[in-house]
C-alpha cells in the first residue's frame, strides 16, 4: 500500500511547471562559502527570470520538503539515520566544519534545503507527465544512491522521482535518464543497476570524480570525454547519442540532469564548453525529447561557478523563445518550432 504524500497534489493550470522554493538556498554563517558550489545559485536563477519578465512568484510551483516516508521509497532507514550524525553530513557535502555543528542545525540549515529540492524533483516528475515538461530549478543529486551519499548529494532525488512515477502514475513504466553533468551519475546508476525499465545515458569527463567502475555497468549509453572537450565535439556527441538512446529505448518519461559544470573554467568539471554551448545543449535535449512526444523533467545539478545561474536562466529563456516550454507549450511550439510536441495530458 502506498504511503500518503504531500508531493503529488493538484497544481492549478495558471502555474507553470517550474518548481522552486526560497528554502533551496543554503546560507549559514558563511559555511556555504567553504565549498566551491554556489549554494545560492537556485534563487539567482529565479531572480534573473523575474528580471526578464518571464516569471512571477504566482506562476511558480512551490516545492515541498520530502518527508521521511517519501525518502524511504528509495533510501534505507539505516542511511537516513546516518544523516543524523554531523560527521556523515560533513563528508557528503564536503564541508569539513559541519562536523562541529550540532545536528539539529545541520538538519535545518543544510539537509532541509536538500530535502526541499528533492521534494521539488518528485513534484516536477508528476508535472512533466501532466504538462509535457517540467523544470526543478534545483535537484540533480546524481551521486546519491539508496544507501550512500557523496559529492554534495545527500538524497537520491532522480531515483525517487522515477520510482514515484512508476508506483503512482498509470502508463509510466519506462524511463530514460540523460545525465549531462560533467561527472558520472553513479548514484542513480547504482539504484537502477538491474532495472531494465530505466535506460541511462551518461556523458562525463572520464578522468574526474567519482570514477565508479561498478556503477558504470548500469550505463546503457556511455560517452566518456577527455579534459578540455569543446563545443563542437561535445554537441555532436550529445546529439548523436541522444538520438540512438531514444531509438534503443523509447521511454514514457525522460529525466534530464542538466549540470552546468561542463562550463569552461570549472575546475571540478575540467571541460571547456561555452555559455552558448550549454544553452544549445539544453535546446538539443528538449527538441529531441519533446519532438518524440516524451515528457521531460529537467533538474539543474552541478555547476560550480558564479556565472552558472545566469547561464541556466538564459537557457530557460531560450527554451521559451523557441516554444519548447511555456504555459501552453504544445500550441506555442507548433508555431515556433519544427518539432511536434506532446499534447497536455489529463491529470
Swiss-Prot record:
One of its GO terms (biological process) is chromatin organization. It comes from the Eukaryota. Coiled coil: none annotated. It catalyses: N(6)-acetyl-L-lysyl-[histone] + H2O = L-lysyl-[histone] + acetate. One of its GO terms (cellular component) is plasma membrane. The active site is at 143. Keywords: Chromatin regulator, Hydrolase, Nucleus, Repressor, Transcription, Transcription regulation. Its main location: nucleus. The keyword Transcription regulation applies. SUPFAM superfamilies: Arginase/deacetylase. InterPro entries: HDAC_classIV (IPR044150), HDAC_PDAC (IPR050284), His_deacetylse (IPR000286), His_deacetylse_dom (IPR023801), His_deacetylse_dom_sf (IPR037138), Ureohydrolase_dom_sf (IPR023696). It is an enzyme of class 3 (hydrolase). One of its GO terms (molecular function) is histone deacetylase activity, hydrolytic mechanism. Its EC number is 3.5.1.98. Weakly expressed in most tissues. Strongly expressed in brain, heart, skeletal muscle, kidney and testis. Pfam families: Hist_deacetyl. It is found in: Nucleus. Residues 14-326 are annotated as: Histone deacetylase. Its activity is inhibited by trapoxin, a known histone deacetylase inhibitor. Responsible for the deacetylation of lysine residues on the N-terminal part of the core histones (H2A, H2B, H3 and H4). Histone deacetylation gives a tag for epigenetic repression and plays an important role in transcriptional regulation, cell cycle progression and developmental events. Histone deacetylases act via the formation of large multiprotein complexes. Belongs to the histone deacetylase family. Interacts with HDAC6. This is Histone deacetylase 11. The gene is HDAC11.
